[in-house]
């Protein structure tokens, strides 16, 4: 029997999202204009809370849809104006270019990255050293590349290896369905479960590695670029100003990696079963024999482009997004990718998030127009200069662990810069606050998948159900890192940030905002 028009419309609205979620969004859309008529300030805060809710519920529906509907309504009822949204987007064009072109550029270097992680996995037999290597490699790559892309590559490696062993274990050849374990003997199931535990721990180490490396440079995370632009810092300035916090955090993060692996805490410590290693090694040996000279040239070209990328970023030869565009042009030209559709695939990962970031800027425009954060900022700025750093770090960390860190970082750096321009805080204090805001948004946010885009990407990937990586298990496995990164970051903000920054300024290493 044909369903009614109303039922058809309800089913189409937000697609497969739960009915309670659809109903909640409709209630938001109905009450927002009514409350705005009574009290714009409360309506503004309600909008922010609703938007954070859509981010927290990202597994129910991609936040672009519900968040976009809320943003459109906010503009329509006068919470902000289209011209202000346009101004916010224009002010953050570099970030949008980063997401559009840099992520797409790295897509064409995936073969090299796959090669690197495959070599690591099969060359290092010690699980503790392998975990440390994955964490370090992810950290280094994320300092120069987009964290989403790094995680996507590690996911590709893990899915590939899981599929290889699953095919052997099920004895079904090319017809094998990696989601179906019904054809696997009990002995192989035990080994497969161990392999899942091994892959879960590696994925979490790599994910945390992207956070450890991403916080260190202005291109590591999208919000870093927003903060660097507000403070007028170059690539080198940003790295040096973050180093009093990020270097100790990196060291402690790597020690945590070794500790949880050695002790087998929080679901870590599972080793690669020897039978799985033999299967994977045979497959890799066969792949290497089949690699042509043309394939080897592609790897060499991608490595050279990687060197160009690091040099161009370090010397700030152009805007980050334009450097990414140069990577796209060189990588496609020199590796033979000439088809428009093949090139278009590179943009599928980044454009949804780019659109979501534009919606963020709409909400930021509402926050500015309605002065929503003024009471909080006023409260923080009443404290002593030293206490301000701690409060900014903690407020950022708390919000970033439940919301998106790009959103949180953008709000707080805008408020801090406004306070500096109004003469409420000094230039020197603003630069210290910028460092506290950056580390506050990046480090505590590893607590949940909501805070780190790379974690959310992992949780929603095809790999997660294969290795039994649920939301709760991810939070549990991230817990030791959350505690260590947050506490060490806080101690560094308290005790090393100001004196080390002052010392580097005296040495003439740091530029200041003019």
Swiss-Prot record:
Coiled coil: none
GO cellular component, one term: plasma membrane
InterPro entries on file: Na+/H+_antiporter_NhaB
Residue stretches spanning the membrane: 23-43, 52-72, 97-117, 120-140, 144-164, 202-222, 238-258, 303-323, 353-373, 391-411, 447-467, 475-495
Pfam families: NhaB
Reactions listed under catalytic activity: 2 Na(+)(in) + 3 H(+)(out) = 2 Na(+)(out) + 3 H(+)(in)
Ion transport found in the keyword field: yes
Keyword annotations from UniProtKB, A to Z: Antiport, Cell inner membrane, Cell membrane, Ion transport, Membrane, Sodium, Sodium transport, Transmembrane, Transmembrane helix, Transport
Topology of this chain in the membrane: Multi-pass membrane protein
UniProt keyword Nuclease present: no
Domain of life where this protein originates: Bacteria
Disulfide linkage: none
GO molecular function: sodium:proton antiporter activity
Localization in the cell: Cell inner membrane
Family assignment from sequence similarity: Belongs to the NhaB Na(+)/H(+) (TC 2.A.34) antiporter family.
Described function: Na(+)/H(+) antiporter that extrudes sodium in exchange for external protons.
Protein name as catalogued: Na(+)/H(+) antiporter NhaB
Species assigned in the record: Escherichia fergusonii (strain ATCC 35469 / DSM 13698 / CCUG 18766 / IAM 14443 / JCM 21226 / LMG 7866 / NBRC 102419 / NCTC 12128 / CDC 0568-73)
Gene name per UniProt: nhaB
